[in-house]
From Swiss-Prot:
GO terms for biological process: cell adhesion; effector-mediated perturbation of host innate immune response by symbiont; effector-mediated suppression of host innate immune response; immune system process; symbiont-mediated perturbation of host receptor-mediated signal transduction. Gene3D superfamilies: 3.90.640.70, Toxoplasma gondii micronemal protein 1 TgMIC1 (2.60.120.710). Its main location: cytoplasm. It holds the Pfam family MAR_sialic_bdg. It comes from Toxoplasma gondii. Monomer. May form homotrimers. Part of the MIC6-MIC1-MIC4 complex. Interacts (via the beta-finger region) directly with MIC4 (via the second apple domain). Interacts directly with MIC6. Interacts with murine TLR2; the interaction promotes activation of bone marrow-derived dendritic cells and macrophages in the host. Interacts with murine TLR4, the interaction promotes activation of bone marrow-derived dendritic cells and macrophages in the host. It is found in: Cytoplasmic vesicle, Secretory vesicle, Microneme; Host early endosome. A motif (CXXCG) lies at residues 103-107, 193-197. The keyword Transmembrane does not apply. This is Micronemal protein 1.
């Protein structure tokens, strides 16, 4: 049948670019996680715990997977927010009053994440200076200049807020660019941020669409944030296609889809937030002092709790269709790709009569079938939870490539992909989607554009 199965990413498949240009492809690596600084901190904390264990501190002799970095208070007398290495077994399942914990996004902003500190019986080591330095270094590597500009716009207008494209107050309010109070966001919920090409992709720090008092703490600034993003110079020339990367700078592709060069380095990052002072306490105890420059929860000025919707007059660079209902159709031409962003337990897709696939999140698999073949090939999908992004690309002579990026139960990102060399598909096929769920969006782009770029 000429089928070949690869775990890879879409652009190298269709353009023949080697994996070394994009990083090693695997289930554990997926673009735009927005969690790389947090992963750096977790890894450093695991090293610190191992060092403390070797030095004789037995309570830190625990499996490395239990050690994480969190910005939080400590035991009873440690009342300031500092970076600490926690044994997750000592954390509470939920926070109460002022014992919440925070994780960090790739622009250095702390956002509430699951868990709470047991003030009387916490097993942690405070390493504020070491971890704060890693945050500063990580911002230069991973913070998109476009997202930094959007954050600066929000912070200048409403001090203490950051930019996200997410939900507002209640589930019926449409997704839009807003300036959010950080304490009102959830690190475990994905929103959209600006990539280092100016397109949007997923990042931590979103809203569930609930109707609590915290859900009121934002300002809708669609036009202003879009203008802030648009004010950043493109890293690629007008004749090149910008390919976002997790780490700055992005890649620039020529008209044939080959890498022509690496995009220009990121501009100096705006002072989006005051970094916590580089201080740490002794692990054995002692009264913790509150550093003067330590970041505390910020609140919007002028009363907060105000939603000022504004309609954007700036056209989107990538046309996007918001789907109303549980199904939709689109035409896929040779040299194009369809990207569907959805939250659903099961998605059925038919590419004309030449190819079909099923993404089943309940049973954890992506299966596909080509032409008249009655048997399905299956690709494992590990612990899927959602949201998910499905990209289908049609190359030369019916070459079909499919990539499914999804959120896992542990809030990490997963990816599954396959390629059919000779699918039997023509140069133009109608693609139908069934079971897309509510709030799905569909975008048609040319090959070479970011698979997750669902809007400008």
């Amino acid at each position: 049948m000429g089928q070949a199965l690869f775990l890879t990413v879409l652009l190298p498949v269709l353009f023949g670019v080697g994996p070394e240009a994009y990083g090693e492809a695997s289930h554990s690596h997926s673009p735009a996680s927005g969690r790389y600084i947090q992963q750096m901190l977790d890894q450093r904390c695991q090293e610190i715990a191992a060092e403390l264990c070797q030095s004789g501190l037995r309570k830190m002799c625990v499996p490395s997977s239990r050690i994480v970095a969190r910005n939080a208070v400590g035991i009873t007398h440690q009342n300031t927010l500092q970076w600490r290495c926690f044994d997750t077994a000592s954390l509470l399942e939920s926070n109460q009053e002022n014992n919440g914990v925070n994780c960090v996004d790739d622009c250095g902003h702390t956002i509430p994440c699951p868990g709470g500190v047991h003030r009387q019986n916490s097993n942690h080591a405070t390493r504020h200076e070491i971890l704060s330095k890693l945050v500063e270094e990580g911002v230069q590597r991973f913070c998109s200049p476009y997202q930094a500009s959007a954050n600066k716009y929000c912070n200048d207008k409403f001090p203490g807020t950051i930019a996200r494209r997410s939900k507002g107050f209640g589930n019926n309010v449409e997704v839009a660019w807003r300036c959010y109070e950080k304490a009102s966001l959830l690190y475990s919920v994905y929103a959209e941020c600006a990539s280092n090409c100016g397109t949007t992709w997923y990042c931590p720090g979103g809203r569930r669409g609930t109707s609590t008092e915290l859900d009121k703490r934002h300002y809708t600034e669609e036009e202003g944030i879009r203008q802030a993003i648009g004010s950043v110079d493109s890293p690629c020339s007008e004749v090149e296609v910008c390919l976002p990367k997790d780490e700055n700078p992005p890649l620039c592709l020529d008209e044939s889809g080959q890498i022509s060069r690496t995009g220009g380095g990121p501009p100096s990052q705006p002072p989006e937030m005051q970094q916590p002072a580089d201080r740490s306490d002794e692990r054995g105890g002692g009264k913790e002092q509150s550093p003067g420059g330590e970041a505390q929860p910020d609140h919007p000025t002028k009363g907060g709790n105000i939603d000022l919707p504004e309609k954007s007059t700036s056209p989107e660079k990538t046309p996007k269709t918001e789907i109303h209902g549980d199904s939709t159709k689109a035409t896929l031409e040779e040299g194009q790709q369809l990207t569907l962003t959805f939250i659903s337990t099961k998605l059925d897709v038919a590419v004309g009569s030449c190819h079909s696939l099923v993404a089943n999140f309940l049973d954890g698999f992506l299966k596909f079938q080509t032409g008249s073949n009655s048997a399905f090939d299956v690709v494992e999908v590990e612990e899927p939870a959602g949201p998910a992004v499905l990209t289908i690309g049609l190359g030369h002579k019916g070459r079909l490539a499919v990539v499914l990026d999804y959120t896992r139960l542990n809030a990490a990102l997963g990816s599954a992909a396959y390629v059919v060399e000779d699918s039997g598909c023509s140069s133009s096929e109608e693609v139908s989607f069934q079971g897309v769920g509510s709030g799905a969006t569909l975008v048609v782009t040319t090959l070479g554009e970011s698979p997750t770029a669902v809007s400008a």
